[in-house]
């Protein structure tokens, strides 16, 4: 049976996900079979597993840190907001319907508790350590009775809790003391250690505050984690994009429209990691400018976000950019927006039966009730100056969409779908305008294909008169995955040096590392 430990926070965005990621990598480095788990996650940024299930991206990164293939059991309940007060409910990877926040929190979520409990039992049998992530704060008194993500899960898993606070925003001590004060005595007893996150400066100046915190709460401080500059790991929450701007300068500028319901923005991480590329999220009120490439990303509600483009003037700005010869591409919902029309007679996304698109691609999208969830492989069909040189190039991605898109006569598809996991293939995906400068696809992760990404960036550089290497040199031999592994190791190394791992292993009831690690044993005692 596995041992378990849980990471909870004094608030959202204090660093729970990143600490779970680091612990998964540390325990893996130390020789343990470790698995991440989050009972209930709310996120727009999702991932499709090998068997066609949908799960949160944070647990995907944590699975990679643990050396595992992502599986829906790591995130049995996923809530994908469809509006300000409603979400699509996904259970063990499959959508079961939409639910208002009121209905969900007033008891209709309790049927999910048995699924969470059974999933935990399965993980206990298959792994040696389970690292569990909580959600938000465990001290939300109005939600606590029906909370499926925090203390109830800790009890089910028999997991001691590490409570994380973000000192960079100020008020960390008050947040810790206040959180513990709002917990029931038996819940506070489950908290076995405190972790201070995002610390900058002289640690000795913080020591008196830590001594006060331990004396006031009776809980040991098991780590003071540094503020890590320039850590290149995928973000799950669009809140993390508020200040995103990958470089002040770059040979190439790629502008991504920051939609109100943006989803799967990890599609652009590989572009952001490329040297000489500035990836800029264009937020409400900011000019689109004259970038080298405009991207309309995926969205949880295509209709509402298309209306946003019309209302803010970005629809006209994208059309002007295309008319000026600036390449424009759309991913999933962004692809649908580029077409002539969106039809929604079943009112899957809004109460509008139809809405005109941007008219940059001769395609029409109809929304249906059944969602396509699949990993897929395809080949570039060619078309226009960008794709004609790489016709036949293999690519891989994944699909998450409820729209069905039909191409107009004379419009070329972007990809031929060779295979969809779970069955299917032999059809086509995406579309390319006759100019070859406007294109769209349902393939999330298309920019993670090294050769396609290298060709795209090389072609953009050539348009600017910039130097470029061979396709293989530009591809960098899979730079994206190599960089991710390097960054996960960097994260683990930094946290290993600032966590009291001896006491954390003691909380788990384990003797400590099985394998020697460089620098092991250098953490605080």
UniProtKB/Swiss-Prot annotation:
Pathway noted in the entry: Cofactor biosynthesis; adenosylcobalamin biosynthesis
GO molecular function, one term: ABC-type vitamin B12 transporter activity
InterPro entries for the chain: Class_I_gatase-like, CobQ/CobB/MinD/ParA_Nub-bd_dom, CobQ_GATase1, CobQ_N, CobQ_synth, GATase_3, P-loop_NTPase
One Gene Ontology biological process: cobalamin biosynthetic process
A Pfam family: GATase_3
Coiled-coil parts of chain: none
Keywords linked to the UniProt accession: Cobalamin biosynthesis, Glutamine amidotransferase
Function, in words: Catalyzes amidations at positions B, D, E, and G on adenosylcobyrinic A,C-diamide. NH(2) groups are provided by glutamine, and one molecule of ATP is hydrogenolyzed for each amidation.
Family membership: Belongs to the CobB/CobQ family. CobQ subfamily.
Protein name: Cobyric acid synthase
Species whose genome carries this gene: Pelotomaculum thermopropionicum (strain DSM 13744 / JCM 10971 / SI)
Top-level taxonomy: Bacteria, Bacillati, Bacillota, Clostridia, Eubacteriales
Gene it is expressed from: cobQ
């Amino acid at each position: 049976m596995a041992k378990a430990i849980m990471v909870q926070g004094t608030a959202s965005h204090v660093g729970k996900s990143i600490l779970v990621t680091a612990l998964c990598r540390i325990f893996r480095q130390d020789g343990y079979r470790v698995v991440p788990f989050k009972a209930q996650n709310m996120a727009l940024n999702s991932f499709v597993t090998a068997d066609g299930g949908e799960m949160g991206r944070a647990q995907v990164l944590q699975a990679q840190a643990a050396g595992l293939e992502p599986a829906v059991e790591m995130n049995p309940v996923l809530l994908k907001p469809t509006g300000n007060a409603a979400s699509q409910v996904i259970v063990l990877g499959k959508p079961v319907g939409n639910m208002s926040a009121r209905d969900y929190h007033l008891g209709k979520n309790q049927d999910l508790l048995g699924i969470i409990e059974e999933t935990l039992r399965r993980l206990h049998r298959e792994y040696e350590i389970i690292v569990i992530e909580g959600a938000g704060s465990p001290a939300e008194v109005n939600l606590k009775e029906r909370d499926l993500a925090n203390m109830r899960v800790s009890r089910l898993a028999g997991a001691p809790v590490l409570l994380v606070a973000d000192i960079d925003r100020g008020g960390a001590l008050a947040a810790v003391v206040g959180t513990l004060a709002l917990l029931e005595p038996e819940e506070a007893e489950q908290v076995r250690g405190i972790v201070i996150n995002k610390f900058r400066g002289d640690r000795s100046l913080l020591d008196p505050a830590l001594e006060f915190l331990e004396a006031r709460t009776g809980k040991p401080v098991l780590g003071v984690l540094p503020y890590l500059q320039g850590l290149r790991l995928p973000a799950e929450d669009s809140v993390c994009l508020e200040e995103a701007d990958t470089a002040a300068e770059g040979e190439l500028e790629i502008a991504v429209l920051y939609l109100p319901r943006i989803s799967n923005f990890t599609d652009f991480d590989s572009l952001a990691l490329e040297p000489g590329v500035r990836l800029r999220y264009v937020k409400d009120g900011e000019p689109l400018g004259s970038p080298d490439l405009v991207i309309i990303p995926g969205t949880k509600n295509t209709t509402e976000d298309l209306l946003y483009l019309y209302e803010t003037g970005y629809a006209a700005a994208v059309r002007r950019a295309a008319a000026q010869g600036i390449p424009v591409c759309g991913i999933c919902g962004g692809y649908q927006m580029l077409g002539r029309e969106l039809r929604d007679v079943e009112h899957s996304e809004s109460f509008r039966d139809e809405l005109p698109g941007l008219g940059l691609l001769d395609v029409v999208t109809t929304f249906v009730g059944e969602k396509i969830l699949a990993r897929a492989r395809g080949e570039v069909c060619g078309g226009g100056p960008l794709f004609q040189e790489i016709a036949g190039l293999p690519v891989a991605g994944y699909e998450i969409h409820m729209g069905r898109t039909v191409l107009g006569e004379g419009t070329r598809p972007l990809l031929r779908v060779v295979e969809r996991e779970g069955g299917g293939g032999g059809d086509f995906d995406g579309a390319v305008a006759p100019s070859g400068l406007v294109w769209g696809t349902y393939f999330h992760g298309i920019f993670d294909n090294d050769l396609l990404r290298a060709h795209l960036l090389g072609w953009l550089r050539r348009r600017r008169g910039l130097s470029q290497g061979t396709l293989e040199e530009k591809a960098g031999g899979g730079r994206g995955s190599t960089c991710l592994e390097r960054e996960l190791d960097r994260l683990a190394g930094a946290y290993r040096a600032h966590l009291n791992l001896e006491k954390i292993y003691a909380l788990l009831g384990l003797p400590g590392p099985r394998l020697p690690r460089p620098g092991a044993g250098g953490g605080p005692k």
